[in-house]
């Protein structure tokens, strides 16, 4: 289907299979397009399911979407103020992209859950400022894949479902831009050297209410590279076997650990900050064993308020 013009509507109820480079299932050049994909979509080997070039587009993917292979994309939009509603599941592998948006003020509502695996695979990719992503279903990211990636300022990502990240190079939520906000209401489980939340930019805020489990060397629950970061860990955090719960590289960071923090094992760290004028408020209890570190700060003028009590046992535990 190839439409040039504004205010086009496509109702695709029968499902769609698109394969090979330059193959496109639905192509619209124009503003205010609406596409309803009610059937299941299977995109592979460099094909594109739905492509829209224009502002104020809306794509409703009510069926399940499977994307596999380098250059393959389920939904691709170039334009501002676009909306993608992913009610069906999203399964991305082999370096494909599930949803790819270039433009400001994009909104993605992902209710169906997301599975992303393999290097270069991305579930949701947005290049533009003021993006909003709502992940209401559970997300499983592995083997070098990325769940949600936003390149732009003032991004907001709400992870209401549970997030599981496993493997080197795997990332649940990745943002490059200033004034980013991530709300992690579901649980966050990171292992095998993956990163749960990875933000590069100043004035980032992470509200982690769902609790966090991080295990294995190089695994990091929350990683922020930038100044004036704020992290609120309201749920319980369990860090073990060389993992790191929260790591901030930048000045004037504030980390509020309101839940219980348990750290066990050599190389394991609950909260790690490299920067000056850092503040850590430990209101929940802190339990450190096996040679782990509860709070580790490198920098001048650091402040730690430990109100929750502390239990430290075993050699090298701090």
Q: PLM ranges: what are they?
A:
Residues 1-318:
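Thr-biased low-complexity repeat/linker tracts and other Thr-enriched repetitive architectures
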